Curated annotation (Swiss-Prot):
<dbReference type="Pfam" id="PF02348">
    <property type="entry name" value="CTP_transf_3"/>
</dbReference>
<comment type="similarity">
    <text>Belongs to the KdsB family.</text>
</comment>
<dbReference type="GO" id="GO:0005829">
    <property type="term" value="C:cytosol"/>
</dbReference>
<comment type="pathway">
    <text>Nucleotide-sugar biosynthesis; CMP-3-deoxy-D-manno-octulosonate biosynthesis; CMP-3-deoxy-D-manno-octulosonate from 3-deoxy-D-manno-octulosonate and CTP: step 1/1.</text>
</comment>
<dbReference type="InterPro" id="IPR004528">
    <property type="entry name" value="KdsB"/>
</dbReference>
<dbReference type="GO" id="GO:0008690">
    <property type="term" value="F:3-deoxy-manno-octulosonate cytidylyltransferase activity"/>
</dbReference>
<comment type="pathway">
    <text>Bacterial outer membrane biogenesis; lipopolysaccharide biosynthesis.</text>
</comment>
<keyword id="KW-0808">Transferase</keyword>
<dbReference type="GO" id="GO:0033468">
    <property type="term" value="P:CMP-keto-3-deoxy-D-manno-octulosonic acid biosynthetic process"/>
</dbReference>
<keyword id="KW-0963">Cytoplasm</keyword>
<protein>
    <recommendedName>
        <fullName>3-deoxy-manno-octulosonate cytidylyltransferase</fullName>
        <ecNumber>2.7.7.38</ecNumber>
    </recommendedName>
</protein>
<dbReference type="InterPro" id="IPR029044">
    <property type="entry name" value="Nucleotide-diphossugar_trans"/>
</dbReference>
<keyword id="KW-0548">Nucleotidyltransferase</keyword>
<dbReference type="GO" id="GO:0009103">
    <property type="term" value="P:lipopolysaccharide biosynthetic process"/>
</dbReference>
<keyword id="KW-0448">Lipopolysaccharide biosynthesis</keyword>
<comment type="function">
    <text>Activates KDO (a required 8-carbon sugar) for incorporation into bacterial lipopolysaccharide in Gram-negative bacteria.</text>
</comment>
<dbReference type="InterPro" id="IPR003329">
    <property type="entry name" value="Cytidylyl_trans"/>
</dbReference>
Length: 245
């Protein structure tokens, strides 16, 4: 089983321009993510995908591998698919988001475990229990509802489901890590963007809208994502506290 990790890194982020290069404890964020991926012995290779010369120079500077991509990709997964096209010998391709400097090898192993155990899902992702008090109403926390077989029914930034009556149903906090069967990723990249994908701003909805399945693997805790300057402050505090909070 050959598995490739691709880290899409875009310089022109709308909410936080240049965020892959922000410094965390004397290392740029993209280096944190790259080193986390490289620490996983189940990845045959790891590479950063970018259209930015600044990011490419940074990656080369710390000894990482980088592939330059087109600058017209609509999503990170489209960028990952371009790179995957150069790696026909890979069975599975993992999209390790460049805004997750604290992603753990354990979380990445859970993401690819179905493939390593002989399953062949088109795509997997991760979910953890949602903090209903803190995150249920937040558009920055993506919610995912699953069917009885652990496949995603829908992802949304809105508070779903609506609780008309009192009761408890499992609502998961979606974590933006994805693994794809190589052949399916190539197929995904040829699909036109879809209405729900566009209105929610969630690329994984393209898969569901075309009738494909996403297996949601369970993990216990969400890692800090850096999408805004405010998130960077939280990340720096997390490091100061010994990365244990």
């Amino acid at each position: 089983m050959n598995i490739l990790a691709v880290i899409p890194a875009r310089y022109q982020s709308q909410r936080f321009p240049g965020k892959p290069l922000v410094m965390l404890d004397e290392r740029p964020m993209v280096q944190w993510v790259y080193e986390a991926a490289k620490s996983c012995d189940f990845f045959q290779d790891a590479v950063v995908a970018t259209d930015s010369d600044k990011i490419a120079d940074c990656v080369k500077g710390f000894g990482g591998k980088v592939v330059m991509t087109r600058d017209d990709h609509l999503t990170g997964t489209d960028r990952v698919a371009e790179v995957a096209g150069f790696y026909d010998d890979m069975d599975v391709v993992v999209n390790v988001q460049g805004d997750q400097p604290f992603v753990t090898p354990e979380a990445l192993e859970q993401l690819v475990r179905p493939y390593r155990e002989g399953e062949r899902p088109e795509m997997t992702t991760l979910g953890c229990p949602l903090d209903m008090d803190e995150d249920y109403a937040s558009p920055n926390a993506v919610k995912v509802l699953c069917d009885r077989n652990g496949h995603a029914l829908y992802f949304s930034r809105s508070p779903i489901p609506y609780f008309r009556t009192q009761g408890t149903v499992p609502v998961y906090h979606h974590l933006g890590l994805y693994a794809f069967r190589h052949d399916f990723l190539m197929q995904y990249s040829q699909l036109e963007p879809t209405p729900f994908e566009t209105c929610e701003g969630l690329e994984q909805l393209r898969v569901l809208e075309y009738g494909y399945a996403i297996k949601v693997c369970q993990t216990q805790k969400a890692a800090i994502e850096i999408n805004t300057p405010e998130d960077l402050v939280k990340a720096q505090l997390f490091i100061q506290q010994g990365m244990t909070s």
